[in-house]
Regions:
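Non-ligating segments of multi-cofactor redox enzymes
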Residues: 1-260, 267-311
Length: 311
């Protein structure tokens, strides 16, 4: 009983820490309070930078831009050149953290986590057809973020940010609603496209109450990009095969429904840490933990060697 309580305590602490980190990061990156009060967008120097998570450029409080929005802006421009900054930004954070960003640093991920805490009968991890639907975000990435902005251009040679304009529910929640409904001039200009975006937002909200992070699992192109880096990112999970008993506790607690003991580097893993907290043998460790453990081991071995030499 004590062991189970200990695991439950670790899981609770991990989840509270993650929630605190998500909330603090969201508040920090959307800290332009005047934007919410005056219904305007921050246009200072920080806006030329990106934050790692899905955080709409047009959110009244946003202090920086969204990498997906920035990528589309570059690709849809008539003076298109490969943006070393945007690509380098995505590669840097992908190589360092992978989908840890989705689990700990994404404001819209926080929104979905909070929605899923709402009591609702028959909660489930996945939508029907999950094993096929997880590939939809890659289709959206290629089609709506890369191809259409690049090639579906008007007479001026400029394209549209297709994902932001026609799909992104995060932009509707964080920018469309507060700016559109709060500004009388913008409110009169709202039309069918805004109604479509609100419909997608409502659908995402309803699904998020019953299913865990449906947008992250099936739609988010940023998660698709970071997921490709999961196997090589500096921060990732490793299984100690000598101590793993393949009990399945990690998959049972995993809300992304991953067989962690088999595929710890799955592109679907958001590195929330729940699996590490419940592992009965402590066989799931992050690369950082392994590096610290190896460092301690080397230090202890060195101290023993010194003691032996002194004797």
């Amino acid at each position: 009983m004590g062991n189970r309580g200990s695991k439950g305590g670790r899981l609770g602490r991990t989840r509270r820490l993650r929630l605190l980190c998500q909330a603090a990061w969201s508040a920090l990156t959307n800290g332009y309070a005047a934007g919410f009060l005056e219904k305007k967008i921050y246009t200072g120097k920080l806006k030329s930078l990106c934050v790692p998570g899905l955080n709409c450029y047009s959110c009244p409080g946003a202090l920086a831009g969204c990498p997906i929005g920035s990528l589309q802006a570059v690709l849809s421009s008539s003076s298109f050149t490969v943006s070393c900054y945007v690509l380098g930004f995505l590669m840097m954070f992908g190589t360092l953290l992978g989908r840890f960003i989705c689990g700990w640093l994404c404001p819209f991920g926080l929104v979905q986590d909070l929605l899923h805490k709402i009591p609702f009968p028959g909660k489930k991890k996945n939508l029907p057809g999950h094993r096929f639907l997880i590939y939809m975000k890659y289709v959206i990435l290629v089609l709506f973020v890369i191809l259409l902005p690049s090639f579906a251009v008007g007479v001026t040679g400029n394209g549209n940010p297709w994902f932001c304009k026609y799909i992104c529910p995060s932009g509707t929640l964080m920018a469309g609603l507060p700016l559109g409904l709060g500004n009388p001039m913008l409110r009169t200009a709202l039309g069918k496209l805004f109604s479509w975006k609100v419909f997608l937002l409502v659908l995402t909200v309803v699904l998020s109450v019953k299913y865990y992070r449906p947008f992250c699992k099936y739609v988010c192109p940023l998660g698709a990009i970071y997921g490709l880096f999961n196997p090589i990112s500096l921060y990732r999970f490793r299984i100690e095969e000598k101590t793993c008993i393949q009990c399945g506790a990690c998959q049972k607690v995993c809300k992304m429904d991953i067989r962690v003991w088999k595929t710890p580097d799955s592109p679907e893993c958001i590195r929330c840490g729940d699996c590490k907290s419940v592992c009965p043998t402590g066989s799931i460790r992050s690369t950082m933990e392994r590096m610290r453990a190896e460092g301690r081991g080397k230090a202890e071995a060195y101290e023993k060697q010194l003691e032996t030499e002194q004797v």
